[in-house]
Amino acid sequence: MDAAVIDTNVLLIANGSHAGFSRNCRDTCVQRLLQRQRAGVVVVDDAHRILKEYSHKTRPNQPKGVGDAFLKWLLQNQANGKRVHRVSITPTAEGRFAEFPDAALQDQFDPADRKFVAVAHAHPDKPPIWQAGDSKWLDWWQALERSGIQVDFLCPDDVRAVYARKFPDRPPPPLPAS
């Protein structure tokens, strides 16, 4: 099964509403979202945390971009178990989840990003997390991989460039092998 958990920045970059990313990055995000609409599974949480974040940051009722249209498609298909899997995640404290595989690593994550990891880990197939623009994930992907969760960096050159700008005194971490 081809399933994925999709970080919100993939939708935002596909919309062209996340500044500082290359045309190639935007095209990649657009292509991956369009491919996902044609085939494969999107994994979200059953309490709609991910869908609420998507809705808050996009315009599914007035779609102008591919990310908006993707969310509209996702909302229309959320009850279709062949295209959307919903998993339960258990909040244990504000922004923390029992399904997050590593408590120490969870402390390093932005609270808004923790749900993506918890959802991937709660799903029986441990689907990859699509990540396009958040450079902090470069510091986390190796620990996540040790827990059985892969991070698929859709825009590796862009995310490494963002990392270099944010952390000029540190070399960008390596990327996962393709």
Language model region names:
Residues 16-24, 57-61, 102-107:
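Short, flexible/disordered intra-domain loops and linkers
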Residues 36-38, 48-98:
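PIN-domain endoribonuclease scaffold, especially VapC-family toxins
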